[in-house]
Amino acid sequence: MSNSKFNVRLLTEIAFMAALAFIISLIPNTVYGWIIVEIACIPILLLSLRRGLTAGLVGGLIWGILSMITGHAYILSLSQAFLEYLVAPVSLGIAGLFRQKTAPLKLAPVLLGTFVAVLLKYFFHFIAGIIFWSQYAWKGWGAVAYSLAVNGISGILTAIAAFVILIIFVKKFPKLFIHSNY
């Protein structure tokens, strides 16, 4: 396969997964208040685990940009938007470091990559919560405790949802994770 066809296929895959993440993010996902289950992370995690670090980083960036330009972002300031809608979704690409290039597919790298990526994403949301969202803290809660509670619970719920979906994908569709040139 020629290099240009490979690049077109890769770019198409990145664009598709970023668009899918954006579309999924339009589905209401609130558990309580600001606590969410962000299943929209799953396409970017899958992209990262299938195509590697760079593809995942770019996919996350496109997803974040789509959220901002379509008005589906809670933006308080440029620095908050940068942290929560560019850095945080881009960080999901770190799962690409756990990419498996050959079969048989092992579950442990998929789960570890997912855990690390979701942890990193919600770390950035935690920092943003302390800096930008502290005025919304529950009565008697400090900024750190509030942000840790909201983002910690959201991160755990998101990781669990991603684990469940990706375990099903690994068991039923393992070829999704192994890229081939065909």
UniProtKB/Swiss-Prot annotation:
Which Gene Ontology cellular-component terms appear in the entry?
A: plasma membrane
Query: InterPro entries attached here?
Result: Thia_Transptr_ThiT
- Tell me if Chaperone is a UniProt keyword of this record: no
The membrane topology term of the UniProt record is:
Multi-pass membrane protein
Q: Mention any Pfam family matching this sequence.
A: Thia_YuaJ
User: Which keywords annotate this record?
Assistant: Cell membrane, Membrane, Transmembrane, Transmembrane helix, Transport
Superkingdom of the source species? Bacteria
Spans traversing the lipid bilayer = 16-36, 56-76, 78-98, 112-132, 150-170
- Where does this protein reside within or beyond the cell? Cell membrane
Q: Does the keyword Transmembrane apply?
A: yes
Q: Which GO terms describe its molecular function?
A: thiamine transmembrane transporter activity
Q: What does this protein do?
A: Probably a thiamine-binding protein that interacts with the energy-coupling factor (ECF) ABC-transporter complex. Unlike classic ABC transporters this ECF transporter provides the energy necessary to transport a number of different substrates. The substrates themselves are bound by transmembrane, not extracytoplasmic soluble proteins.
Subunit text: In E.coli forms a stable energy-coupling factor (ECF) transporter complex composed of 2 membrane-embedded substrate-binding protein (S component), 2 ATP-binding proteins (A and A' components) and 2 transmembrane proteins (T component), probably with a stoichiometry of 2:1:1:2. May be able to interact with more than 1 S component at a time.
Similarity field: Belongs to the vitamin uptake transporter (VUT/ECF) (TC 2.A.88) family. Thiamine transporter subfamily.
Q: What is this protein's record name?
A: Thiamine transporter ThiT
Q: Which gene encodes it?
A: thiT
